[in-house]
Swiss-Prot record:
Binding site for substrate: S50, R159, H235
Protein species of origin: Pseudomonas syringae pv. tomato (strain ATCC BAA-871 / DC3000)
Superkingdom, natural source: Bacteria
Record Gene3D superfamilies: Phosphoenolpyruvate-binding domains (3.20.20.60)
Family designation: Belongs to the isocitrate lyase/PEP mutase superfamily. Oxaloacetate decarboxylase family.
Cofactors required: Mg(2+)
One Gene Ontology biological process: pyruvate biosynthetic process
Cofactor, free-text remark: Binds 1 Mg(2+) ion per subunit.
Database matches in PANTHER family: OXALOACETATE DECARBOXYLASE, PHOSPHOENOLPYRUVATE CARBOXYLASE
Stated name of the protein: Oxaloacetate decarboxylase
InterPro entries: ICL/PEPM (IPR039556), Oxaloacetate_deCOase_bac (IPR023687), Pyrv/PenolPyrv_kinase-like_dom (IPR015813), Pyrv_kinase-like_dom_sf (IPR040442)
Catalytic activity of the protein: oxaloacetate + H(+) = pyruvate + CO2
Annotated keywords: Decarboxylase, Lyase, Magnesium, Metal-binding
Amino acid sequence: MPKASHQDLRRSFRALTSSNSCFHTASVFDPMSAQIAADLGFEVGILGGSVASLQVLAAPDFALITLSEFVEQATRIGRVAQLPVIADADHGYGNALNVMRTVVELERAGISALTIEDTLLPAQFGRKSTDLISTAEGVGKIRAALEARVDPEMSIFARTNAAIIPVQEAISRVQQYQAAGADGITIVGIRDFDHLAQVSEGITVPLMLVTYGNPELHDNARLAEMGVRVCVHGHAAYFAAIKATYDCLREQRQILGSESNMSATELTHTYTQPEDYVEWAKKFMNVNE
């Protein structure tokens, strides 16, 4: 079977987001997972920023991974991927000028779409990690991303977190990002369909929801009816791989019992030690949450 070009895959993604259906992402974190996802019939994959940090650094999701490290992993995936891959590009790795560089590098890596979020990252001295940048700065980042794009088929989605801001502010943000020219809007933190209807008021571009498996949002037909074209449930495949690796190596070492009763979440916590980063943030950055 002939290999699809990067532009072919970008066109495929645009066809998905132009349809009347809602598609669910496969978590892809390396070339093998991308191959498996395509073979199993997934229409779209996503390289999560948190997963890239775990895969490349064995570090928690504290915006520690650099653009170069993220792009290297995206390039490895893009070399073999036969399904469109979305890159969770976090905050674009800096200001609007950094966003332009991010877009250039991820486009060359073969990514079909990317998201740029308005979270204030990395965490700032004396500021909460859940703070958002101003809407004006977020608009500037989206405009910069569009300016930097060479292939018009690559999609650029603006992302915001509706869980930590009032509904009216969320509405204002997504409407302004749409007006800035974003190809789509990614929303985190939607509670239920009523909340989705409020926040997406006036939005005509495709929606991407990051639900983390929220049971209140499991009606796929209703998601599609409300303009959601991509749904991200999380990265279960990656965490299952961590668990399987641990259990396999544990068995090889002939440790009593073929499987441990440690969950993937517990294993991830054990090997990344996020509490260390929280303490360092308190100690060196005056961040107390």
